[in-house]
Amino acid sequence: MTELKVSVPATVIPDVIRDPWIAPDRGPGQAHQARNDKPESVVEVKKLWTVFKNGDKESVIHKDLDMTIERGEVLSLVGGSGTGKTVLLRQMLGLEHPTKGDITVLGKPAAELGKRGAASRVGMLFQQGALFSAFSVIENIAFPLRELKTLPPEVIREAAMVKLQMVGLSPDAADKMPSDLSGGMIKRVALARALIMDPPLLLLDEPTAGLDPESSDSFCTLLRALHRDMELTVVMVTHDLDTLFELSTRIAVLADQKVIINDVPKEVVAFPHPFIHEFFLGPRGQRAMELLREYPFTV
């Protein structure tokens, strides 16, 4: 496997704008020190219920669900159809709210992520990229910074250009439109936008969906390098077993309306449950397990 070293240049975004949740009592230049103090829970989910109503009928998706995600992990959420994987991801981002229970992100209620400056705390890569079709590449990447309305245009463009190159795209791509991009380039632009304010937490919804094998491998290599070099905590939803085993340090399995196991990949595969047996030990799972045996991953 090719090892990619990502160059993380000095940021052009003031710390007090970029990261208010991590260390609100620290001055400029100190906000990111909190990442290296000691191990901590980045996401905590406690007694979570998600109930959808359709007329007189109720569908319980999550019931008393508990989960903790520690700093520095790459945790993957897997489960069958209807187990609420993406719903849980959106709840962590504050885009949806549980029926009851608590989700805290970086020590604060996830519901507050909808407020100004959320991009400095959590970055989100949506499944199809979710780029604005009327914006150029550089305008898409810069969008979260422009929404702050606190930085001059030249600083915003400089920060966006840094992230454009950090995800492996050339400066020539800056003025292209989304309609001119390949699927792999769309993913990279969306990733650059998710990272524009250096958030400590990155959420990925099917990051390699729609990519050919070569593009998928290249994108996984990029994600692993960014996770390492930017000291990210990553939460990922994926159905792709190759991506799952290549990136995950832990896997949380959703079944029976809860997390039935949250552990390292080898322990999860050995856990006795019908979904796990079908998902991991079928022909596709066996092929992906070869990758795990070849590349034993550590943080």
Regions found by a protein language model. Give the residues of each.
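Catalytic Walker B motif of ABC-type/P-loop ATPase nucleotide-binding domains
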Residues: L202-D205
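Conserved ABC ATPase signature
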Residues: M177-L181, M185
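The feature captures the beta-strand-to-loop junction immediately N-terminal to the Walker
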Residues: V78-G80
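Conserved ABC ATPase "signature" region
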Residues: E154-D172
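ABC ATPase NBD coupling module
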Residues: P109-G123, E147, P153-E154, V268-F271
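Conserved catalytic motifs of ABC-family nucleotide-binding domains
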Residues: D198
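Helix-to-loop junction immediately C-terminal to a conserved catalytic motif
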Residues: L93
